[in-house]
């Protein structure tokens, strides 16, 4: 069995449901410290939701101008398993069947972490004095609130003036085969909770009440039909979607006094959070609604245009697999949104994502070593460029 698979299984066997780390970071620090990494814990959060964070950095070969830094970012936490009896094998017992490795976190994203650790081990064995600095940013709070994880580490790094140049996030980005898709950006996410106030009353006497659902519907229809922007070469147009509508007392003869609507923007770089907020408020005001609206900005959009990192990863994928990879900004958010604040080039690359968060999550074993090799080839290419500069 390959060293990558062995490490992946060791990580999968640790039941690290958010915010638990279950010893994953201790295991990983034990692999990184002998390679010359300085491992620093940056745990955060209240005792009731304590998050484990690791920042591990290895300096470049000494002398000269400040070295550029490549960071691998990942999360050791996983989502809940769902009913264990529905799994074909225990979710935290790594199992091999039909050429696949099964277990919670196999694809999201413990195999990616294992692959990058082994890639770094192989790279440093061949290049013990690299021209670039290497770092790992790992957290146990990506699948949850994402408040005390990567966000906190990035803030601490920024406060002490540490600079990052390239970042690879090990999210499962591939579709059918490892390397067929990478993410070079993500849309922003902006959520709103709208409460429209009316007057509660008997359903037989509407003249004595004011139905907030009826009042809200025209405004909601207009919001749903609005073209917020047209997207661009890298992003689809900004979308607005309702996720929940709550109104009524449960009785069938009462006009409700309020209706609550939860909605979300996934917005591209053609729009801003403040601009979207202003447009929504103007629309609601125009409809004459009596309302309250609270906003939650989950993350700004980010984009890494084709450059050093994208080119290095694309070439590594082609050299290893023969695939011409597709650049994409689709899908949900990731911790890349926090890292992009302090790192100009961020991409995401990992195994196929067809089974993430599902019963019987797995990776195809034949995809594992190519992923490790792609990471190693990327390291080699970026290091060669830095050495030649």
From Swiss-Prot:
Gene for this chain: dapE
CDD domains in the record: M20_DapE_proteobac
Catalytic residues of the enzyme: 77, 142 (proton acceptor)
UniProt xrefs under Gene3D superfamilies: Zn peptidases (3.40.630.10)
Organism: Paracidovorax citrulli (strain AAC00-1)
Catalytic activity: N-succinyl-(2S,6S)-2,6-diaminopimelate + H2O = (2S,6S)-2,6-diaminopimelate + succinate
Zinc among keywords: yes
Name listed for the protein in its UniProt record: Succinyl-diaminopimelate desuccinylase
InterPro entries in alphabetical order: Bact_exopeptidase_dim_dom, DapE_proteobac, Peptidase_M20, Peptidase_M20_dimer, Peptidase_M20A
Cited SUPFAM superfamilies: Bacterial exopeptidase dimerisation domain, Zn-dependent exopeptidases
EC code: 3.5.1.18
GO molecular function term, any single one: succinyl-diaminopimelate desuccinylase activity
Enzyme class per UniProt: hydrolase
Names of required cofactors: Zn(2+); Co(2+)
């Amino acid at each position: 069995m390959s060293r990558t698979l062995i490490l992946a299984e060791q990580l999968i066997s640790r039941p690290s449901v958010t915010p638990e780390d279950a010893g994953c970071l201790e295991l990983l620090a034990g692999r990184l410290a002998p390679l010359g990494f300085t491992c620093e814990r940056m745990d955060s959060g209240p005792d009731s939701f304590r998050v484990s964070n690791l920042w591990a950095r290895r300096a470049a070969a000494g002398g000269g101008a400040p070295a550029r830094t490549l960071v691998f970012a990942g999360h050791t936490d996983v989502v809940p398993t769902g009913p264990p009896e529905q799994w074909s094998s225990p979710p935290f017992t790594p199992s091999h069947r039909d050429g696949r490795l099964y277990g919670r976190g196999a694809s999201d994203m413990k195999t990616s972490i294992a692959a990058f650790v082994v890639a770094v081990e192989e790279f440093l064995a061949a290049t013990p004095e690299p021209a670039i600095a290497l770092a790992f940013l790992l957290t146990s709070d990506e699948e949850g609130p994402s408040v005390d994880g990567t966000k906190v580490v990035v803030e601490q790094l920024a406060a002490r003036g540490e600079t990052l140049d390239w970042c690879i996030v090990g999210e499962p980005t591939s579709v059918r085969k490892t390397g067929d898709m990478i993410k070079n950006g993500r849309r922003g996410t902006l959520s709103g909770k709208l409460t429209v106030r009316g007057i509660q009353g008997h359903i037989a006497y509407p003249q004595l009440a004011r139905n907030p659902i009826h009042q809200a519907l025209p405004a909601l229809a207009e919001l749903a039909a609005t073209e917020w922007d047209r997207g661009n070469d890298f992003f689809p147009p900004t979308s607005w979607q309702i996720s929940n509508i709550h109104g009524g007392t449960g009785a069938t003869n009462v006009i409700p006094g309020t209706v609550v609507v939860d909605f979300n923007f996934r917005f591209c770089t053609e729009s801003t959070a403040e601009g979207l907020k202003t447009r929504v408020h103007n629309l609601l005001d125009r409809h004459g609604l009596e309302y309250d609206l609270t906003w939650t900005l989950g993350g700004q959009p980010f984009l890494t245009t084709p450059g050093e990192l994208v080119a290095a990863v694309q070439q590594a994928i082609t050299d290893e697999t023969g695939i011409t990879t597709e650049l994409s900004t689709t899908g949900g958010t990731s911790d890349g949104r926090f890292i992009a604040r302090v790192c100009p080039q961020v991409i995401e690359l990992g195994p196929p994502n067809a089974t993430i968060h599902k019963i019987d999550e797995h990776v195809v074993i034949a995809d594992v070593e190519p992923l490790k090799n792609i990471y190693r080839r990327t390291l080699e290419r970026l290091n060669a460029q830095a050495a030649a500069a």
